[in-house]
Amino acid sequence: GGKVIDVAKLASYDKNVFFVSMPTTASHDGIVSPLASIKNPKTSTSAKAHAPIAVIADSKIIANSPFRLLSAGCADLISNFTAIKDWQLAHRLKNESYSESAASLSIMSAKMITDNVDSIKPGLEESARLVVKTLFSSGMAISIAGSSRPASGSEHTFSHALDKILDKPCLHGEQCGVGTILMMYLY
């Protein structure tokens, strides 16, 4: 899961050694990104870490994990649409660094999900494969940009706010999905 992979990323970074990511679910793009999510009861931050040298994802295991996790991964990917809009706005208004290649890869990842939404089904290895591939490319966009901007914007800020105020927050991707709907309405 995400916590174990984040610990491996941080340890890899701290010891300056390679690591291999072996996700058992496909619930977020952290399986390949060069950032680790550090959470405690009051805050959530991202720390610089190593991206994996390889990812080994067994599509059968992922397909047999709870479908809610795969759905959360899809919602995390769809949030790339608002993340890119936010990044473009920051570039235009604040002259923030912007990478067209990272943005394009991020949008492509989100579009692969929306274009294939009808074929993403519980227990189907092809569904797991598609979601893992798109999570992988979304995480690669983060590596290209050198920041989380291609995959994290106002919808993620909304999710972090929910983490603080809810007694029992939902899955990260679920919260980002709701945040995406709200933020896209503002655009």
Q: Residues of each region from the PLM?
A:
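Gly/Ser/Thr-rich loops at beta-strand to alpha-helix junctions
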Residues: 1-5, 27, 148
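N-terminal small/polar loop signature for handling phosphorylated ligands or for N-terminal nucleophile
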Residues: 1-20, 119-130
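Basic, gly/Ser/Thr/Pro-rich low-complexity segments located predominantly at protein N termini
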Residues: 6-7, 35, 144, 178
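Generic hydrophobic alpha-helical membrane-span motif
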Residues: 8, 29, 64, 160-162
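A glycine/threonine-rich phosphate-anchoring loop and its flanking beta-alpha core
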Residues: 13-111
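Active-site segments that bind and position negatively charged phosphate/pyrophosphate groups
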Residues: 102-187
